Regions:
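Extracytosolic ligand-binding ectodomains
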Residues: 1-128
Length: 128
């Protein structure tokens, strides 16, 4: 089966390995997809506050326009036009290994490649 998910056991980037080690030391368990999404969301907020030097809503909106930060799955950018995150997803196949379902033959699909273009967003907004 073709699936999306979070193959924590097979991501070998230094950023992910650091996240995985810290997570397992703290929680004595492996991270789930919600773990990586939550971590990336909090790191995004921290980067936005640091850039804005404030928690004021308008300053954060400005700070998030084009904000790029590192994450365990690679860089994430918040598009200037609509503040959509480019965080992607892992896509692969399922396989039974030792009685457990695992994701194999996976690759990271950068969300930036799948978001609507700026022109499309402008067109949709014009209809609202």
């Amino acid at each position: 089966w073709l699936v999306t998910g979070y193959p924590w056991y097979g991501i070998q980037t230094p950023e992910h390995q650091a996240f995985l080690k810290a997570y397992q030391e703290r929680f004595k368990d492996y991270p789930r997809q919600g773990s990586i999404i939550g971590y990336s969301a909090i790191m995004s907020l921290a980067a936005g506050i640091k850039k804005a030097q404030s928690t004021d809503t308008e300053k954060l909106i400005t700070a998030f326009s084009g904000l790029t930060l590192s994450s365990p799955v690679g860089p994430i950018t918040y598009r200037a036009q609509d503040h959509q995150s480019t965080m992607g997803s892992y896509v692969g196949r399922t396989k039974n290994e030792g009685g457990k379902g695992v994701m194999v033959d996976f690759r990271y699909m950068d969300g930036a490649k799948f978001l609507p273009t700026d022109a499309q967003v402008q067109q949709w907004r014009a209809k609202d």
